[in-house]
A protein has these predicted regions:
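Segments of small-molecule ligand-sensing domains
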Residues: 307-317, 328-380
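Beta-alpha junction/loop-to-helix N-cap segments that form part of ligand/metal-binding clefts
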Residues: 26-32, 54-60, 72-143, 211-217, ...
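An alpha-beta-alpha
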Residues: 149-210, 233
Length: 409
């Protein structure tokens, strides 16, 4: 009898261990939520430190989308859960945060925020059956090597090329200056693409100035060189933190009609110059998102965001918001599966009508959508329209006429 009891006990233990092993394999890094009640989304980004404005925007945009989707019934009947971890902008911390999210049971990753940390997270995710729906990591190669990684934002070489084309399409200038960070992948990537396209369009780079992380407090030499060059546009493919320093030191040194032209890294510039928002006057920023757009989807998003966070959403918030809706569309297209392989297979087949535009994806993970530009004046950013372009074209024509008159005299 005693042996029989022991045998029954051992059989029960073996059965329990088999169940436990089965549960672990169902959830341990597979990304598949088919047997769970919720779909877990995880994000990583700087919530503290100098780049916290970007991370908080991404977190808030994603949170808002999750709340809306859950209130509308979820995705295939399942509610979404979101966990967003602080990376402090450090790639190693970002990978550690990604591991923490995998231990939590994350099904889909929203990637990271900055390009450097994104590359590290995407590489770490390669071995897991998890879709990475990258929100804002824009360096060309930061999603390379992982065929389950897709992104919402523009990639850097696209932004640099689009910026150069925008100059000629809107007759902004035929000669430009450039100020970029030579030890930053984001800045260098945009710079290289911009210069290459300027060569194709006939725009002359008249003056180029650089800085590094170690020299990011005093830009007086660069400001003076660019101001004395007489260019009407200075291309600044840098982040808002450094842009605020540059613009503060540049105030009063340039003519009133000079544009400071940048890409998505400038988003949040007004918050960096809140002591005097006119420092950002004539900043022109390439973006797929404009908070003052008449699009009903954008208006609804802006109102909901303002109600929730008492702030106007920037492009980073909009990208994250669209990323969550893209996850929803992919899960629905994959018949409810959250397997990374299944979601990656359907990504090139879906279309998402987002607040950053109509999006489709190529097999390489990059998105296809249109870009526009925002012009800042007196602390307000508005879509840069034809009236602005006509003013710029008129200024160019006037300069040419003045030059011709001087030559005749």
């Amino acid at each position: 009898m005693k042996k029989k009891v022991v045998a029954m006990f051992l059989a029960a233990v073996m059965a329990l261990s088999l169940v436990a092993c089965g549960s672990k394999s169902d959830n341990g890094g597979s990304g598949d939520a088919s047997g769970t009640e919720t779909i877990k989304l995880g994000g990583v980004g700087p919530l503290t430190g100098g780049y916290a404005n970007y991370g908080l925007s991404v977190q808030h945009g994603a949170e808002l989308a999750v709340k809306e989707i859950n209130a509308a019934g979820g995705v295939n009947g399942k509610q979404l859960e979101l966990s967003f971890q602080d990376s402090q902008g450090d790639p190693e911390s970002a990978v550690a945060a990604y591991g923490k999210l995998m231990d939590w049971g994350m099904n889909v990753s929203l990637g990271a925020v900055l390009s450097g940390e994104t590359a590290s997270v995407v590489a770490a995710a390669k071995a897991d059956d998890v879709l990475v729906m990258e929100t804002t990591g824009s360096a060309d190669k930061c999603i390379d090597g992982n065929d389950k990684a897709f992104r919402i934002c523009f990639y850097d070489s696209y932004q640099g090329t689009a910026a150069a084309d925008y100059l000629t399409d809107n007759a902004l200038a035929t000669e430009v200056g450039v100020f970029y960070q030579s030890d930053n992948d984001y800045s260098v990537g945009l710079y290289n693409a911009f210069v290459a396209e300027c060569q194709n369009t006939g725009v002359t780079i008249k003056e180029t100035q650089t800085f590094t992380t170690a020299t990011s407090t005093d830009f007086s030499t660069q400001v003076n060189a660019l101001a004395s060059s007489g260019v009407k546009v200075v291309f600044i493919p840098i982040y808002a933190e450094d842009a605020s320093t540059f613009l503060t030191q540049a105030k009063g040194k340039f003519a009133d009609d000079v544009y400071f032209f940048g890409a998505d890294g400038l988003d949040g510039i007004l918050g960096k110059v809140s002591q005097d928002v006119t420092i950002a006057d004539n900043v022109l920023m390439m973006t797929p998102f404009a908070a003052d757009s008449a699009d009903p989807k954008v208006q609804a998003f802006v109102k909901a965001y303002q109600d929730a966070y008492n702030a106007t959403p920037d492009q980073f918030a909009a990208d994250a918001y669209d990323a969550v809706y893209a996850v929803k569309a992919a899960v629905e297209a994959a018949n409810g599966s959250t397997s990374g392989a299944d979601l990656a297979a359907v990504m090139p087949t879906i279309t998402v009508e987002g607040v950053t535009g109509t999006m489709t994806w190529s097999a390489d993970g990059n998105t296809n959508k249109a870009a526009s530009a925002i012009l800042y004046k007196n602390g307000v950013g508005t879509l840069f329209g034809q009236d602005n372009a006509n003013d710029a074209a008129g200024a160019e024509s006037g300069d040419a006429a003045d030059t011709a008159a001087d030559a005749e005299a």
